[in-house]
Every structure is written in C-alpha cells, then in structure tokens.
Amino acid sequence: MSPARESGNNGATPVEPIAIIGIGCRFSGDATSPSDLWNMISKGRTGWSQNAGDRYKMDAFWHPKSDISGAFNTQGIHILKQNPAVFDNDFFGINGVEAKAMDPHHRLMLEVAYETFEDAGITMDRLEGSNTGVYCTGYSPDYDAMLSRAPESFPM
C-alpha cells in the first residue's frame, strides 16, 4: 500500500495510508471465507442446493410455467448455509432487542466487515478512535417488506 501524499507538498511528506486491503465474504454453500470460496470453485463445486430447509419454502412459489408472476420453476436455490438468525450481538455492542430488529443482511455485513479487517491485519484496538470509514454496499428490501406485513411482530 503506498502512502497518500498531501496535495501541494510536492510529495515530500507521506501521510497515513488511505486504504486497507482485506477481504471477507459470504456465498452460498460452504463458502463462508475467501479460502472456502476458492476451495469450492477449484474443486468444481457450486453453492447450489436442491433443498432450502425451513428457511425458504420453495414449493410455495414453484409453478411449471415460468411466466406466472411471483412464481418460479427452478428445482434448487443458492442459499447461505449459515443461519442468519445466529448473531453475536454482544460482540458488536448491540443490545438483544435492537439485534432482533436488524435486517439479517446488516448483521452479516457487520460480521464480514470485521473479518475483512482481520484479513487485512488490522486490529480493533488500532481502529478504535481513528478516523476510519468503511464503504460497502448491499440492497435487499425484503426484510422491511416482511416487517411491514406484520408490525406487531416487530421486536420493540
């Protein structure tokens, strides 16, 4: 990683590095880390599963005609094996009620962001109190839609 240089100083004085290079990931199947992903790909396996277990009722959406709105006609799914309800909220300083109300995607994002710092060799002690930003993205509005259908079940 090359250090950033302040503009106007002719490159004489290096300042703090501006990038941390690390990686974390979650993919379907057994790929819960970059090395797991590589192992899966290098052995010619995929994360496809014929059964989603109790996390997704495929039969409820299956229809032999692919043009039926809201239905699909696939025989399998790519799904994380990790249960998204399992989350160490205390580790992240989040109380139990707030953790239950969080979108599972956000919980996974916190875990993966932490693992990315670990992969980069950056400890939390080194980050604490620093002027550090983390940029990541993801979008899935389905959790909000589920909560709006049953607001009485919102854990508050």
Task: Report the location of each language-model feature.
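ACP-dependent fatty acid/polyketide chain-elongation machinery
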Residues: 2-101, 106, 110, 114-118, ...
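Structural signature of cysteine-dependent C-C bond-forming condensing enzymes
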Residues: 3-8, 119-133, 145-156
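Generic beta-strand/beta-sheet core signal
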Residues: 21, 135-139, 144
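A glycine-rich phosphate-binding loop feature that marks nucleotide/adenosyl-phosphate handling sites
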Residues: 54-62, 128-139
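Serine/threonine-rich low-complexity intrinsically disordered regions
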Residues: 83, 123, 138-142
